[in-house]
Each structure stands twice: as C-alpha cells, then as structure tokens.
C-alpha cells in the first residue's frame, strides 16, 4: 500500500513539474510564456507572458531570439484618436525593480510572422529573452490554439 501511495505521489509531483513553465535567472522571473495561433497552419501568432523583476536594479528587455518564425518582433499597442494601433518597439523596454511587465493583448506582446512549420496545441517552442548587461533567459513558449481570449 505504501508503494502505491508513493507512486501516486511521485506521479502527481512529476506531472505538476512537467506542466509548469516558469523560468527564473538572476532574480528575474518569466511566467507562463505562450504563443496564440488560430489554427496549425496559421502564419502569424502573438506571444504573451509576464516578466517579473525581483531584483533591486532596473533591467531592459532588448529582444527575443528564436527559430520559431521568419520574423519575430516585440510590439506595443497604442490608442491614437480612438483607434488601436500596433507597432514594433525600436528600443529596449525598461522594467523597474520589483515591477512586472505583462505581455498581453492591447499592450506589449511578441509578434511572429511566417512560422517555420505548423504547430500542435501544447507544443513547446524554445526561445531566449535577451536583456541588457548580458542577461539571457532561455524559455519555452507553449502553443495555444484557437480564437479564445488570452487568460494568464
């Protein structure tokens, strides 16, 4: 009986660990990175996550490196004359100490154009977030299919 309970416990713990996809380095946490695509053959997708700066220093997000699509960019959405406009970011994004930067719809997000292949729901895709001062955080985006709204 003890062996069965132990096996169930280990199975539960290992599954929880395998489904979690949060990343941390040098007091910077990356929470739940996902790429939303409408269908497997989509050519465009958006990436969302939270970046939490738990350090006592400012950090700047410079770029994203990935072999996911032909082009990947950091974008922001601004409201101009009652119209939302999306545009690529040309500079680094500052994250102050003890602050969180959330990549979400109608805000900062990653855009992926011309994916290198078709994806499956829940597929994990490797990438690297590049910050100033040489900080690089390897992450994995989880592919989320469908038209439903993003919920973190």
Give residue spans per PLM region.
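Bacterial N-terminal signal peptides
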Residues: 7-15
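Compact, glycine-rich, soluble single-domain proteins
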Residues: 21-152
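Positively charged n-region of N-terminal signal peptides that target proteins for export
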Residues: 1-4
């Amino acid at each position: 009986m003890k062996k069965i309970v132990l096996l169930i416990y280990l199975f539960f713990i290992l599954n929880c660990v395998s489904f979690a996809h949060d990343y941390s380095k040098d007091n910077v946490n990356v929470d739940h990175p996902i790429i939303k695509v409408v269908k497997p053959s989509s050519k465009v997708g958006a990436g969302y996550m939270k970046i939490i700066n738990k350090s006592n220093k400012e950090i700047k997000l410079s770029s994203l490196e990935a072999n996911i699509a032909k082009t990947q960019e950091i974008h922001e959405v601004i409201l101009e004359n009652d119209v939302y406009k999306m545009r690529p970011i040309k500079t680094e994004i500052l994250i102050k100490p003890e602050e969180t930067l959330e990549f979400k719809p109608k805000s900062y997000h990653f855009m992926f154009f011309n994916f290198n292949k078709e994806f499956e729901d829940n597929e994990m895709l490797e990438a690297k977030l590049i910050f100033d001062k040489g900080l690089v955080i390897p992450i994995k985006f989880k592919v989320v299919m469908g038209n439903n709204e993003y919920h973190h």
